[in-house]
């Protein structure tokens, strides 16, 4: 099911411009997070991760606000093996150290108890979903790519991104706002 514009997600609609924007955002996120996992962010790793996640969440929000992408068939072509993101995951875990694990209500409407999550897992999960869509996009199947990115944003990586965004924001906020208690004042 090749998509050079002839296979629109809905009759009469051209999804290629949005697919191009999402593909560029996905590449930027993957490249940025990979650089940070390699240690290129130094002491600014957490604020830079906050920026990366905020930017990809904006892209996801555009997908969530768009009409549903409907494929003409009810199947998704195979894109090959899932990427091995262990180097990314372990690199992020090493950079985040004690700030990697956090507690979250994954679904604030359904979950009554907080669950432990890891930022490194969340970011690798987001990257995996974005890469899956990029594999469709780079194979010339922009409709399938867009369908995948939209579906997986609503169902999977958007949830991980939202949780990671809150956790990263909390780390940045604590670093900037927490004041050590002055023993002379207490």
PLM region spans:
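Amphipathic, non-membrane alpha-helical segments in soluble helical-bundle scaffolds
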Residues: 16-19, 23, 43-46, 82-85, ...
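Short, charged/polar, low-complexity loop and linker segments
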Residues: 102-114, 139
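Short secondary-structure capping micro-motifs at structural edges
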Residues: 73-77, 113-118
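Low-complexity intrinsically disordered segments
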Residues: 2-20, 24, 186
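Acidic, proline/glycine-rich low-complexity IDRs
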Residues: 1-7, 114-117, 125-186
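Alpha-helical repeat scaffolds in large eukaryotic proteins
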Residues: 27-38, 54-65, 90-93, 97, ...
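N-terminal interaction modules that seed assembly of large macromolecular complexes
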Residues: 14-79
